[in-house]
């Protein structure tokens, strides 16, 4: 499970073969990688798999970064999955939503009451990751 999250993390950055891109091009992968990691933690907490949560929080993730023309593999902690998706900010402004977190709104919409995991479980996981 954690290896899949690690692979998703590599999609958040531009491949060196891509020479033309815009700043929002990889935002969808940033949101997907964050949501996947959050769901992993939420499900582990619900199943009381604290060993998995601990492993996820202690693991060093290898993420290949290609920003600025570089090609640098970097090991980092789980915070790599919480990347700012600028396109969500622009959506908030463009639609005059006045929301604090469009990402949270999308999660709430995708995980209504009765879903697995529940939105409440995702909020709990987010709090654990914040602490």
Annotated model-derived regions:
Residues 1-131:
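Long, low-complexity, intrinsically disordered terminal regions
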């Amino acid at each position: 499970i954690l290896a899949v999250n690690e692979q998703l993390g590599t999609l958040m950055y531009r491949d060196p073969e891509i020479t033309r891109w815009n700043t929002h091009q990889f935002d969808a992968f940033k949101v997907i990688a964050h949501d996947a990691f959050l769901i992993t933690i939420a499900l582990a907490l619900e199943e009381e798999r604290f060993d998995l949560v601990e492993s996820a929080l202690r693991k060093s993730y290898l993420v290949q970064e290609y920003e600025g023309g570089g090609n640098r593999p970097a090991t980092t902690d789980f915070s790599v999955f919480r990347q700012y998706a600028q396109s969500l900010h622009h959506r908030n402004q463009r639609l005059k939503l006045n929301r604090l977190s469009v990402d949270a709104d999308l999660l709430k919409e995708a995980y209504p009451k009765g879903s697995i995991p529940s939105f409440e479980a995702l909020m709990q996981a987010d709090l654990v990751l914040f602490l």
